[in-house]
């Protein structure tokens, strides 16, 4: 229920990567549930627009923090900006997702993925999760990906960082059972977001499950928090991935997913 969610995970939610895509949708839906919001992103003007939109549609207080999660000191900025704010819900959604063959990507790009996709979520969970644990209530949503469960050509490093988020969240789900703090890893398949469109996939060549939409993906994530350690949004995606993992040897699974990526991103 609306009130139940607010009393369990309020009064403030912090969402990273909130300036577009899934992060924006999280901001909208969490705002609609009556929680105040701290929205974090590197893109200042887009972030300001999202904040304004959510203030208008939900009437909740919205605070924005512009920072780069690949910076070693990003937490100092966040700590300063959230002083005196009780964050009861953390949505670790920001990610750096370049697509390309491993040896065609710069080392700098690959290391940045680890900074934004692994190091930053770890620090955020360590920081905000500890205070939730002390208060005996709260929620943590970590965005993983359908790519986290097997090797995926063209996003080798990215998929590996998403596996880190999946395993971290599932482990914390178990460690924190009964503590009042809920943890969930969300594993969406390809989702129709600006970020995905910017990767320029040749969608017309592909035969796999249809693209997810951000709205139902986020709604499912908010609904499943506290019910399960990890979740694949979208019934068709869930069935496809679960069945394929049960029926196919790992080698075949990697090749199947890889052939789809080659259709999308191959020359």
Report residues per predicted region.
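Residue(s) in the substrate-gating loop at a strand-loop-helix junction
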Residues: 145
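C-terminal helical subdomain
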Residues: 185, 204-242
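Canonical Rossmann dinucleotide-binding motif of NAD(H)/NADP(H)-dependent dehydrogenases/reductases
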Residues: 1-37
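Conserved NAD(P)H cofactor-binding loop of Rossmann-fold oxidoreductase domains
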Residues: 93-99
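Substrate-binding pocket helix/loop in short-chain dehydrogenase/reductase
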Residues: 101-114
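Conserved glycine-rich Rossmann-like NAD(P)H-binding loop of the short-chain dehydrogenase/reductase
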Residues: 35-49
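Active-site helix of classical SDR
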Residues: 125, 161
């Amino acid at each position: 229920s609306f009130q139940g969610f607010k009393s369990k995970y309020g009064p403030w939610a912090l969402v990273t990567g909130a300036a577009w895509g899934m992060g924006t949708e999280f901001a909208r839906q969490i705002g609609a549930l009556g929680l105040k919001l701290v929205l974090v992103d590197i893109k200042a003007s887009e972030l300001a627009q999202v904040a304004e939109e959510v203030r208008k549609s939900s009437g909740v207080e919205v605070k924005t923090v512009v920072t780069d999660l690949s910076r070693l000191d990003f937490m100092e900025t966040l700590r300063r900006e959230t002083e005196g704010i009780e964050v009861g819900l953390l949505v670790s959604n920001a990610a750096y997702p370049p697509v390309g063959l491993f040896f065609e990507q710069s080392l700098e790009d690959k290391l940045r993925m680890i900074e934004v996709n692994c190091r930053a979520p770890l620090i955020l969970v360590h920081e905000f999760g500890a205070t939730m644990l002390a208060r005996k209530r709260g929620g943590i949503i970590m965005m993983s990906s359908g790519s986290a469960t097997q090797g995926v050509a063209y996003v080798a490093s990215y998929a590996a960082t998403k596996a880190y988020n999946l395993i971290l969240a599932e482990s914390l789900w178990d460690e924190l059972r009964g503590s009042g703090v809920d943890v969930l890893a969300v594993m969406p398949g390809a989702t129709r977001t600006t970020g995905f469109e910017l990767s320029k996939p040749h969608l017309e060549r592909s035969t796999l499950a249809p693209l997810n939409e951000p709205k139902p993906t986020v709604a499912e994530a908010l609904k499943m928090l506290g019910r399960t350690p990890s979740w694949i949004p979208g019934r068709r995606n869930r069935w496809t991935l679960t069945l394929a993992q049960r029926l196919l040897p790992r080698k075949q699974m990697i090749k199947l997913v890889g052939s789809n990526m080659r259709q999308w991103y191959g020359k």
